[in-house]
Structure formats: structure tokens, C-alpha cells
Amino acid sequence: MVYVSLEDLIYALFVENKSTIHDIAKALKIDASTVSRALNNSPRVSQKTKDRIMAKANELGYQRNLLASNLRKKKTSTIGVIVPRISRHFFSSVISGIEETAYDAGYNVIICQSLEQLKRERKLVETLLANRVDGVLLSVSMETVEYGHLLKMKNNGTPFLFFDRHCEIEDVSSVLIDDFQGGFDATEHLILNGCKNIGHFSGPQELAIYRNRTAGYRKALEKHKIPFKSELLIRSRLMENDGAEGAKTLLSLPYKVDGVFSANDVAAIGAMKYFKKEGVRIPDDIAIVGFSNEPVSAMIDPSLTTIDQPGFQIGQIATKLLLEEISNAPSAKANMAKTTILKSSLIERDSSRK
């Protein structure tokens, strides 16, 4: 059921464009119902009549009231997207995949960013629902360890789907990369380049992506019989200053750290800047691997080895799955939930070549 506020109903029914179908009908001396059918491309109206009506509509500057039309159809042909930060290349590439796929399917996209704040994320969900989007694509904030707002969205029947960062909610689909394998590959790469004491910058372990990247890090250590040292695992919000603080902590340890795997490129770059300021040579003294392949990672000196994520493809797949859920009956949605896991790839650059 779609609930419509009184304000929306008044707007949809009475705040029309300057020209209406009645103006077109009056000018052509035909019924308004015929004009309506023609504007909706009904086969009941001849092409000749359609052409006359379209010409007059253009002449009068007529524009359809999409809100009224959508209210009648009980859909808006709009999906909402919430990302932590639009400025991150990974999320902007996901958005590109979403927008292109949605556009091809006749949908508009509303893009929002939580700025890693749970309070803001809650408000954005409320706003999107108030705007009656047909569905939502969401990558949760670092603060999202409680998700009553998402359960509310599920319970009111609005289709939504996670990408990249997700919460474990039953019957909700996700499109992810193999974060465990990415963490494993990054760490093993450092080990194969001679590193033994490898620091790891991670995010909140309540979020599956950081938990899985950390698990991959630990598995690589285990495979190569390198003991895990808890002081080498540094958790933060993974901003650039967090990377610098993490680097400072690693340099204060009583033994030499010779490698760093950061769960994102931003913190890795912060660490690199700090190491260079302290006279630490990269990769000779410390080799570094990031995660996400931000464009800047290829331009800094030395260039940053990183894990690449197929952001555009994630956006495409997530949108296609969401549109499938939107088009199916509510009773069928619970049976459609699926987790799609895509592969990541290691891009070797100068920060880890010894």
C-alpha cells in the first residue's frame, strides 16, 4: 500500500503545468480523453492524430505532471543510493555503474552520502522513504553497528540491497567483493617479498568487510607460519591522519616492522607520508600495500601497491538485482535474496617491490 500525504495529493491533483490536456483538447476541438491516450501512446489513437496532438502540446509548452502520474501508478521510477563518501573513487565508480544501469531501465537515481555517520544514515533512509523511492542501494557507514532503521525499511516492504559494506539481515541481498581473499593476497604478497613483521590497519570489526580483510591477513600469516602479534593490528576510521598515527605506533614498537597492509588506500597514503617524514625508506625499510585502488595511489611516489575492486561492475549488478526485486511481487522477494561475491585483484607497484 502507498501512503500519500495531503500536501502531495493537492500538489499532484491541482498544481498542474500552465498548459493542460484540456487546453490541448480545446485548441484542437477534440476530447481530453483522446489527448490523454495520444500522450500515453495508446494504439487506440491514429498516428495522424497523435502527431497533431504532440505538435499542439509542444506549441503550448505542455509538460506531463510526473508526480500525479506516479501517484496513480503507485511507483516513482526512482531508486535511492546511500554511500559513505562520494569523494572516494571506489564509490563514485559504483555510482557510475548504478546510474547507467538505472537509466537504461527508465529509472532516476537519488544519490546521498552518510559521511560515515549513523545518525545521518538514518535520516537519509527516512528521507528516501518519504520521497517514495521504489528501492534503495546502500553501503553502510562505519558507525552502523545497529540497524533498526534498515529493519524498518525491510518491514515496510521497500526493496533494498547492500553493496560493499553490508549488515547481516535475513532475506536482503548483497553484492560484495571477496574481502577475505583480498586481505590474504595483500598480506601474502608482502610475505613473499620478505616481510615478517607486518602491521595491519583495519576498520571497525563490527563491519564484515574489515573483519574479513583482517581474517585474510591472519590466514596468510598462518599459512606462512608467522605468529600473529596483536600490537600489529591497529583499528581506526582509516582516514589519512589515522594512517599517520598508525605508522607512528608501528615505529614505536621495540622491533622492526617491515611491512604494512592497510584496509584502504587513504590510511596507507597517510602512513607513507609519515614514514617518509621520519626518513623511513619505502619499500626498502617498510613495504606497503593498500586496498581499493584510488587514482592517487598510482600517482604518489612511490606508487602504491593495492587491491583493485570492480566498482562499476558492482554498481551494475547491484542495480539489476534491485530492479528484479522491485518488479517481483512482495511475496516472492524473500526467496530472491542472494549474495554475489566478485573477485578483486592485486596491482603491484613500487611501494612493495624490493
What residues fall within each predicted segment?
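N-terminal helix-turn-helix DNA-binding module of bacterial transcription factors
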Residues: M1-S77, R353
